[in-house]
Regions:
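Well-ordered beta-strand positions
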Residues: 83-84, 192, 213-216, 227, ...
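Short, surface-exposed secondary-structure edge patches
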Residues: 51-55, 225, 282
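RNA pseudouridine synthases
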Residues: 1-196, 209, 307-320
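Pseudouridine synthases involved in rRNA/tRNA modification
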Residues: 1-36, 206, 216-219, 229, ...
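Short coil-to-beta-strand transition motifs
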Residues: 74-77, 202-210, 284-285
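Short beta-strand segments enriched for Tyr within beta-sheet-rich domains
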Residues: 159, 232-240
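Short histidine-centered loop motifs in beta-beta connectors
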Residues: 47-49, 213, 219-220, 224-227
């Protein structure tokens, strides 16, 4: 007997590719299974057959028919730092380098596999209840920090509604290149996707709004508190680049892929014959706080993810060798 599902793309997932969207909404099924369903025409977008790479828009309707016996994705243990949990909502501190959903096949560990394992086997509130994680927003693989997950359809609808209504407040910590002069500002630049999968500012694009405040200045760098008001793909990264201050590490939109001590400390050189290890080699972006209403009518709460170890180490080094900018 086949299993049918229908989803409406929320604003928080606008711009996501069809295959990634299905993996987000149907995490129990393997990537290869979902690819096969798309190729066989068992998936439609707005009643039309679609390709795996189709970028979805807010309000698109995705319908899926899954045949009996379709291969499911297996849960697997992943070290998880649980920041908040009740019977309906889970917030975890996603480590950098861990993809939320499978990106290249099904070999690497993923957050979704770890969440499945946690809910089924470890959660004191949910194990044995048959619940599965329902993603309501995303973090890039190389971004660390707090991620909200719904446990049931009601919580998924409630959280998604808060994202769509811009009720949820998100706060990131970002290290960017150069000295940012304005203490605080709002970046209001519509974004559109290029043919190569990158995002760029464009008057033809969709509304994208980001606020920032300066936390600390260093010689050649600035530490920002960043509050995105919309949830476009790569929004923070593209907006910061647009004002001339890209993330200090961003291989896609910035100037480097790693930061080494030798680039910060003038007299430092690695020992002869040794290869220097970078202080940090991922996006200098951390999802620090999220404020939301876990259940209707109970009031807002804030969940905070401690600064990731590599980001914290980098900031300490900057304070020591790059002083105040």
């Amino acid at each position: 007997m086949s299993e049918s599902h229908s989803f409406i793309v929320s604003q928080s997932l606008e711009g996501i590719r069809l295959l990634e969207f299905l993996a987000t909404k149907l995490p129990l099924y393997s990537i290869n299974t979902l690819k096969g369903l798309i190729e066989k025409g068992s998936v439609s977008v707005n009643t039309k057959r679609a390709s795996a790479g189709l970028a979805l828009g807010e309000g698109d309707e995705v319908a899926v028919s899954i045949p009996e016996g379709a291969r499911r994705y297996e849960p697997h243990p992943v070290p998880l730092e649980v920041l908040f949990e009740d019977g309906h909502v889970l917030a975890v501190n996603k480590p950098t380098g861990l993809a939320v959903i499978p990106e290249r096949g099904e070999i690497e560990a993923t957050l979704i596999g770890g969440l499945l394992h946690y809910l089924q086997n470890l959660s004191p509130l949910s194990r044995g209840k048959g619940l599965r994680p329902r993603l309501v927003h995303r973090l890039d693989k190389d971004t660390s920090g707090v991620l909200l997950v719904a446990k049931d359809p009601e919580a998924e609808r409630h959280l998604s509604g808060q994202f769509e209504g811009r009720v949820i407040e998100k706060e990131y910590v970002a290290l960017v290149d150069g000295r940012v002069e304005r203490e605080e500002a709002t970046i209001n630049l519509p974004l559109e996707e290029t043919t190569r999968g990158k995002m760029r500012p464009s008057p033809r694009g969709k509304e994208a709004v980001t606020q920032y405040k300066i936390q600390e200045r260093f010689n050649g760098f600035t530490l920002l508190k960043v509050m995105p008001k919309t949830g476009r793909t790569h929004q923070i990264r593209v907006h910061l680049k647009a004002i001339g201050h890209p993330l200090s590490i961003d291989p896609l939109y910035g100037n480097r892929s790693a930061i080494f001590l030798s680039s910060l400390k003038a007299d430092y050189k690695p020992k002869k014959g040794q290869t220097e290890t970078p202080i940090i080699s991922r996006l200098t972006l951390h999802a620090h706080k999220i404020t939301f209403e876990p259940l209707p009518g109970v009031g807002k709460m804030t969940v905070e993810a401690p600064m990731a170890e590599d980001m914290d180490r980098l900031i300490r080094v900057l304070r020591k060798y790059k002083g105040s900018g």
